[in-house]
């Protein structure tokens, strides 16, 4: 019985090492864009605060002080470059975004760049958005943002009130994108291998499985 017991002990230890939470891994960073640096009709992007929790959920809090609510003509798009390469994703050569977190008035959508075009048909469960106190909050788990530990991002806002929409961008066009490092335990990105999940299901007292 030594062999099975030893194998079970190794599996149990591996479960705990892989799946047990690591405290204090959350992270946050502030960013700033100039106030009133765009046409008055545009949603004015100013302070941006990005954070993540230990589960790898990344939240973008975007201050728009000239809006108490988003108008039906307002569009805000947050573009994420997950691989840091301008030659991949959409808008190649300029930014290369793989993901887009968008809001049009009160409709929140999640986009993936598929073969150079945006696909907004599949919304991940981790994605969500809200607007309150002149602050737009967009959230998604980094697993749904390519699983990268460093995310490069840009934000664009527009108000389509006529033939000539008003825009604001953060950071400004012609400057480098902002970058955020996600600090979270490995299990926030990695799913345990099949054999380990099976061992943990059979011996729950020795393992703590996190549902995915």
PLM region descriptions:
Residues 1-11:
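Bacterial N-terminal signal peptides that target proteins for export
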Residues 89, 106-117, 152-155:
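Short, well-ordered strand-loop elements centered on a beta-strand within folded domains, enriched
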Residues 9-21:
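Bacterial N-terminal signal peptides
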Residues 55-57, 73-77, 98, 124-128, ...:
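Extracellular structured ligand-interaction cores
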Residues 113-145:
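Acidic, glycine-rich flexible loop segments
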Residues 26-107, 160-167:
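Surface-exposed, glycine/proline- and aromatic-rich loop segments on solvent-exposed faces
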Residues 56-58, 106-109, 134-136, 207:
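Hydrophobic residues embedded in beta-strands of well-ordered beta-sheets
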Residues 82-98, 144-201, 205-212:
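Acidic/polar low-complexity flexible segments
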């Amino acid at each position: 019985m030594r062999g099975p017991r030893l194998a079970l002990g190794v599996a149990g230890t591996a479960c705990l090492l892989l799946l047990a939470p690591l405290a204090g891994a959350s992270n946050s960073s502030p960013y700033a864009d100039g106030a009133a640096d765009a046409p008055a009709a545009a949603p004015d992007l100013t302070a941006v605060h990005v954070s993540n929790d230990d589960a790898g959920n990344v939240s973008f809090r975007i201050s728009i002080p000239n809006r108490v609510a988003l108008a039906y003509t307002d569009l805000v798009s947050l573009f994420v470059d997950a691989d840091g390469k301008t030659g991949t994703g959409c808008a190649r050569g300029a930014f290369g975004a793989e993901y887009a977190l968008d809001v049009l008035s009160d409709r929140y959508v999640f986009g993936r760049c598929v073969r150079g075009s945006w696909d907004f048909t599949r919304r991940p469960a981790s994605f969500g958005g809200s607007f309150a106190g002149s602050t737009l909050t967009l959230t998604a788990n980094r697993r749904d943002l390519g699983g990268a530990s460093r995310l490069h991002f840009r934000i664009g806002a527009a108000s389509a009130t006529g033939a000539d929409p008003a825009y604001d961008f953060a950071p400004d066009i012609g400057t480098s994108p902002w970058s955020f490092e996600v600090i979270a335990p490995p299990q926030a990105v990695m799913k345990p291998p099949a054999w380990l999940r099976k061992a943990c299901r059979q011996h729950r007292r020795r393992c703590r499985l996190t549902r995915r």
